[in-house]
Amino acid sequence: AHGLPCVICSTGLSAGEEARLEAASEQVPVFRSANMSLGVNVLIELCKQAVTLFGGEFDIEIVEKHHHNKLDAPSGTALMIADAINTRAGGAYEYVYDRHEVRQPRGRQELGISAVRGGGIVGDHDVLFCGPEEGVTLRHRAQSRGVFADGAVQAALFVDGRAPGYYTMSDLLR
């Protein structure tokens, strides 16, 4: 890090790479997020509130959509959303990816994650909370890749001059 604050936005880091970031944060400010969009991170905060308010009585499905050139499925952002929900629920959920091979009723502890790839979709994430008589859908739609650059700039401004430590979008949003 050469004594400079770091802003890291990447998915798929190994445990060793994550450990190196943690170690670097003892010397310099390290800001880490799998998605730099402020809107996605607000969506995550809203999902955590919804999990608390619905108390496990609602089924949860995440549907993410991206352009046809995106390599990973599900996206790192979809997994970030799922992990935030599951952490808030005390690890109660098991992830089920798509359902094309599942031939049984949905289990209460399932958290469904589905991926769609097509055209030039920058990034859409829908989180469905489905109850027996009503449902709530929370959605984020990135209409341009500029939102990720804007978030990265805000993250850089946030860590500039801060003490060494490991910072996330939750810190920036507070």
Segments from the language model and where they lie:
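Rossmann-fold NAD(P)-binding glycine/threonine-rich loop
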Residues: 1-4, 9-32, 38-50
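C-terminal substrate-binding/catalytic lobe of Rossmann-fold NAD(P)-dependent oxidoreductases
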Residues: 56-174
